[in-house]
Amino acid sequence: MQDRIRKIIHVDMDCFFAAVEMRDNPAYREIALAVGGHEKQRGVISTCNYQARKFGVRSAMPTAQALKLCPQLHVVPGRMSVYKSVSQQIQTIFQRYTSLIEPLSLDEAYLDVSESTAYQGSATLIAQAIRRDIWQELNLTASAGVAPIKFLAKVASDLNKPNGLYVVTPDKVQEMVDSLPLEKIPGVGKVALEKLHQAGLYVGADVRRADYRKLLHQFGRLGASLWKKSHGIDEREVVTERERKSVGVEYTFSQNISTFQECWQVIEQKLYPELDARLSRAHPQRGIIKQGIKVKFADFQQTTIEHVHPALELDYFHELLEQVLTRQQGREIRLLGLSVMLKPELQMKQLSMFPSDGWQ
């Protein structure tokens, strides 16, 4: 464990885009609802409510496939300007309790409340207060996880969804990690999970007892990362938007995709709007020096392309996508990401936007 015990909260809004639509239109509250593109335009689902999820509908799923699973699904186009505005209201609530806020998207964020004096420094009470404020002021529900380390806070926020809170105290970290199924750990996808199971690794305790060198040999960086997490170690800090040299968003597909059109729909309808909103928060002047795109294939090989570009433009990502997919070689795609490098205030540094440990 780390010497300094931190208090990290991960807040995740419940089916955010769909929840905003249900809040603003009572007719949507009792039906299976999704926000996404039209099936005739090969659209994809941005998010859906829990009624739709019961039928297997998921984010980034082609709308046509979602309608086959749930014929009564009502699909509405997204109102990104509204979602951005609500996200800003949520950020304002966070700021009452801490300035150490790391947004991951419009609907989720890490908060470090280690030094907060609110509620006598109780992270549990702060998380309860944040969820209460969001409900009372915005009529939306949020789930939260509290833990001394980031990845467990994120795991915990999912355990009592929707509209729930789960707290992992420092003395319970190792116990929770030991019993945690590996598929619950962020970054462990289907293919990796199969390989882990083939190696006899199913829960955190299995990894903790494994030989580190064998893990590194078999699984590379993933093995090293899992070994640390299995010992309750996650040294990543909560990084505020203004501390960043780059801003990025990415999405791991529940089912691999393969075509340019599928990739472009996800970029246009999901990733680009989120990147646009995050850039506005991180750098209101919107000064950038590069745009980049990242693709991870089904075989876990990753490739990136980044080019100098002075302004965020959707059409430029179209060009970058065409270029990066020339490296596809028939492989399916499991992850897609976009990023921009911010223009520093004093000096332009040519740093990679896609560091080896991934975007935070």
From Swiss-Prot:
InterPro entries: DNA/RNA_pol_sf (IPR043502), DNA_pol_Y-fam_lit_finger_sf (IPR036775), DNA_pol_Y-fam_little_finger (IPR017961), DNA_polymerase-Y (IPR050116), DNApol_IV (IPR022880), PolY_HhH_motif (IPR024728), Rev_trsase/Diguanyl_cyclase (IPR043128), UmuC (IPR001126). Its EC number is 2.7.7.7. Its cofactor is Mg(2+). The active site is at E108. GO terms for molecular function: damaged DNA binding; DNA-directed DNA polymerase activity; magnesium ion binding. PROSITE patterns: UMUC. CDD domains: PolY_Pol_IV_kappa. GO terms for biological process: DNA-templated DNA replication; error-prone translesion synthesis; SOS response. Its main location: cytoplasm. Mg(2+) binds at D12, D107. GO terms for cellular component: cytosol. The keyword Transferase applies. Residues 8-189 form the UmuC domain. It catalyses: DNA(n) + a 2'-deoxyribonucleoside 5'-triphosphate = DNA(n+1) + diphosphate. The record marks F17 as: Substrate discrimination. Pfam families: IMS, IMS_C, IMS_HHH. Keywords: Cytoplasm, DNA damage, DNA repair, DNA replication, DNA-binding, DNA-directed DNA polymerase, Magnesium, Metal-binding, Mutator protein, Nucleotidyltransferase, Transferase. Binds 2 magnesium ions per subunit. It is found in: Cytoplasm. The keyword Repressor does not apply. HAMAP family: DNApol_IV. Belongs to the DNA polymerase type-Y family. Monomer. Poorly processive, error-prone DNA polymerase involved in untargeted mutagenesis. Copies undamaged DNA at stalled replication forks, which arise in vivo from mismatched or misaligned primer ends. These misaligned primers can be extended by PolIV. Exhibits no 3'-5' exonuclease (proofreading) activity. May be involved in translesional synthesis, in conjunction with the beta clamp from PolIII. This is DNA polymerase IV.
